[in-house]
Amino acid sequence: MESIILRRVRMILAIFIVIVTTASPLYAIDGNNRFFAYGVGQRSCQDYIKFREKRLESLEQQYERYTKDELYEIVDKIVEHWIAGFLTAHDLYVADTYNIAGNTSMNDIKARLETICRANGKQYFAEAVITLVQQLNPQRVKADTGK
């Protein structure tokens, strides 16, 4: 009799632990509140502002075969893809979120990131994107509408 009760208590406790751990928000940061960003996310907001202002002098010197407009288009696509990857990862790993950007266009996202970066040019670009995601959260699409 005692072993049946003990098994049930263990089962209930196991179910409770599974529910609690899966319902908790997931933060990919270490104990010191730090994280590692790849690619564009490692750049500073000052670099992003330079890019938005089409100040690509160092790239122009490094890649003379491209025009300034061609370089801007290349960098623009790299930045867009990095942002899209970040937002996709967010959608995958955050509960109750199907599409964090909702109806926000990529151009609007980039403009909002510029505003965030102008407020703190020394922060990493990844931090600016995190700030943007926090701003977008209230208007996120929570579930697939099936359209």
Spell out what each predicted region is:
Residues E2-L13:
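Bacterial N-terminal signal peptides that target proteins for export
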Residues R118-K147:
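C-terminal partner/receptor-binding element of secreted or periplasmic proteins
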Residues S24-A28:
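Sec/Tat signal peptide C-region and signal peptidase I cleavage site
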Residues M11-A23:
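Bacterial N-terminal signal peptides
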Residues I5-L6, I29-F35:
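N-terminal intrinsically disordered, low-complexity tails enriched in polar/charged
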